[in-house]
Amino acid sequence: QVTDYLSALCQELADMGFDEILLDNAGYPYDGQVGVLATSENRPEDRTVPVSAFYARLAGELEAKGVCLSVCAYEDLAPGDEVYSGMTAGVLAQNVGRVWLDAGVSREHYEAILATGGFDNPAARIVSPAGAAGEGSWYR
């Protein structure tokens, strides 16, 4: 139900004329005491599968409308294959147009991580805070 709602919301934004949709924290919870959450039967062993399926669904629907699906990523989300969030470099490479970085993330380090995950031309598809935010922008 949640993915259906988010899909409908993203499509509505695309119909309003937005050319890029940026998702933030669009994976399984990864910060704090997530071990408590990991005991539920609803939490799959390999969280990359549902996260990748969710991104692929949105990316396909948005691409048909000429809209780029982007994701905000943090340093600890993509370096490995075993992450709590399910959002790895490989998942991002397969499904998103651009990756927006948190202010504390090294752009060069992240370019290498994403290239290893199969991200084509990561330098052109990464947005970092340095020089990206215009006057009055929320992105810093």
Label the predicted regions.
Residues G90, N95-R140:
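Substrate-binding cleft of secreted/luminal carbohydrate-active enzymes
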Residues L22-D24, E45-S85, W100, P122-G131:
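Aromatic-lined carbohydrate-recognition surfaces of secreted/lumenal glycan-active proteins
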Residues D19-T48:
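Active-site-proximal loop/short-helix segments
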Residues Q1-Q11:
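Active-site-adjacent "subsite" loops/lids of carbohydrate-active enzymes
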